[in-house]
Amino acid sequence: IYGEESFGPVVCVVRVNGADEAVRVANDTEYGLSAAVFGRDIARALEIAKRIDSGICHVNGPTVHDEAQMPFGGVKASGYGRFGGKAGIAEFTELRWITIETGPQHYPI
């Protein structure tokens, strides 16, 4: 179960020797939808969370509810792109600039 992407209340406990090995083990997968880091030192937990390759990473708890304005999505084989809020709009649109000259030209020729 450790190497598969599962959806449900599942916990895999793997013993590691320190934060660097924990990050290496966490990133050693083809998936990357969601992750979690638990620790007493919030600043250290946040630094570790930033090093994990996932679309979402929680510190000291799972998602309690989805928030529509947050950019939801994974990385690697867990998906491409984000949906939700401005990030979702940006992911599925292409910004363009189109102009139309309707009157006399602004600059003389």
How would you describe each model-predicted region?
Residues 1-109:
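Conserved C-terminal structural/oligomerization subdomain of aldehyde/semialdehyde dehydrogenase
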